[in-house]
């Protein structure tokens, strides 16, 4: 199980995994779960899809005469993000390009996922 962080309190509370920066739980003030809780039908909750949504032809990105294997919905959902900021009601997770990512996606990037709970509102 991936490391998880909880934000929120008196209104909504949210739980975010560092693996994929995925929102894995969202509860209202009464404690009722509002988010799909992964099961055999679909093992995810709310995955971050980056750098693509959907599937490329033959799962291959072509750029400047080179081919890169890039599977459906990209790689962010299976990558470990780094927590760069955390408080009771806010968390920021970051994924930077690396040698591993450039083997699949030849562009520099910095992807930040920011989750902020304010009363009954979660902003992503």
What is the meaning of each model-derived region?
Residues 1-123:
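Surface-exposed acidic/polar loop and edge beta-strand patches at domain peripheries
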